A protein has these predicted regions:
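Active-site loop segments of alpha/beta catalytic cores
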Residues: 1-189
Length: 189
């Protein structure tokens, strides 16, 4: 969507599907080049972030129609494992995200971790997330981060981590609470 602008992209979903397919063809090849460059240079896995593909902006039927075929191809051509992140509450597309062949999905705090883990694990897909990036990690207390990370683990996340990126000025102490929660959780298991 960034190539033509989010608003234009969303209009094209209805009015210019051929334009959508042309944009996605360009991004498909760029995505394959980027992921394999990373793998050729030692990456263990590659994360694709889809900021405009979530149900808040794109209906699930259009996610399935336009994005799933492209994502499947990008994942198939990857030289290593791929994780797919869809911003916002991605509950409406979790099943489709898992059907792209990814090794993992990354979900935000808005998504239902328990339900999404159940869907993903049934398909052999790992789940990453879902400590809130802005409200908890960036502006919350260390105790809040610890509590939210522990909750994500209790809800079944395979990899406890921020639900989205990490804001550069996030307090280091808050970031360390994710590790502490993980260590404490698994020392009790």
């Amino acid at each position: 969507a960034n190539l033509v602008g989010t608003e234009q992209f969303m209009k094209w979903v209805y009015k210019n599907p051929d334009g959508i397919n042309k944009v996605l063809e360009v991004t498909r090849e760029a995505a394959v080049a980027a992921e394999n460059f990373a793998f050729d240079n030692g990456a263990d896995y590659y994360v694709f972030a889809e900021p405009t593909a979530g149900p808040a902006l794109l209906r699930p039927k259009f996610f399935e129609k336009f994005l799933v075929p492209v994502l499947k191809d990008v994942v198939d051509r990857a030289k290593g494992p791929v994780v797919l992140h869809v911003c916002g509450n991605s509950d409406g597309v979790i099943d489709m995200m898992c059907d792209t062949g990814v090794a993992g999905i990354s979900i935000e705090e808005k998504a239902d971790m328990k339900a999404d883990v159940e869907i993903a694990h049934a398909k052999g897909v790992k789940v990453f997330g879902n400590v809130a990036t802005a409200t908890t990690l960036f502006s919350g207390t260390p105790e809040e981060v610890y509590q939210e990370a522990t909750q994500a683990l209790e809800n079944g996340t395979d990899f406890v981590c921020p639900g989205c990126g990490i804001a550069p000025p996030s307090p280091l102490e808050n970031l360390l609470q994710i590790k502490k929660a993980r260590d404490d959780y698994f020392s009790k298991s």
